[in-house]
């Protein structure tokens, strides 16, 4: 049987969105190392599997750009980080245009903060008809409680939570493809 469940990520229909991975946020974020490692894993997987990536930054003039740990692993096809002032990425015209240009219907979200920008973006994207997945171990907030509350709200609102590694294996689909060995090195 070749048909897969529609809630599984598919590399031909998925877009990776990396939200606000900037130093001022990460300086105070809960489990920064875990968060950064998992966002890197998703970005590297996207590069290997040719999955489009859109990154955002919140108020770059004041908060700066993406941290090097993330920018250095982005695929060359990734757009320059989109600067925004609104908390929901979906309210940015530039983000909406980038999303539409990809033609992708599944959105895999990661970044910060779970209960603010990630949640507002995810909820707006669900409202717009996208299937939204949030890698629960590739998002975080300043406290574990805020992260947990954000994830509960997302799940209750129709967003699909997953682990970053689970997302990677869904995007791979099988071990018998050429990219498998490259990605296996990332998860081992």
Task: Name each model feature, range by range.
Residues 17-19:
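Short hydrophobic beta-strand that contains or immediately precedes a catalytic carboxylate
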């Amino acid at each position: 049987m070749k048909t897969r469940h529609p809630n599984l990520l598919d590399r031909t229909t998925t877009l990776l969105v990396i939200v606000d991975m900037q130093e001022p946020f990460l300086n105070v974020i809960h489990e920064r190392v875990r968060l950064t490692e998992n966002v890197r894993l998703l970005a590297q997987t996207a590069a290997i599997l040719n999955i489009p990536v859109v990154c955002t930054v919140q108020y770059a003039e004041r908060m700066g750009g993406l941290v090097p740990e993330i920018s250095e692993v982005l695929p060359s096809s990734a757009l320059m980080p989109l600067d925004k002032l609104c908390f929901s990425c979906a309210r940015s015209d530039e983000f909406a245009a980038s999303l539409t240009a990809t033609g992708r219907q599944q959105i895999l979200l990661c970044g910060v903060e779970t209960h603010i920008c990630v949640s507002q973006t995810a909820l707006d994207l669900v409202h717009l008809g996208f299937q939204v997945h949030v890698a629960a171990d590739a998002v975080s907030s300043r406290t574990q409680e805020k992260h947990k509350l954000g994830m509960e709200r997302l799940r209750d609102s129709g967003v699909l939570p997953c682990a970053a590694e689970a997302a990677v294996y869904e995007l791979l689909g099988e071990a018998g493809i050429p990219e498998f060995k490259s990605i296996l090195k990332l998860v081992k």
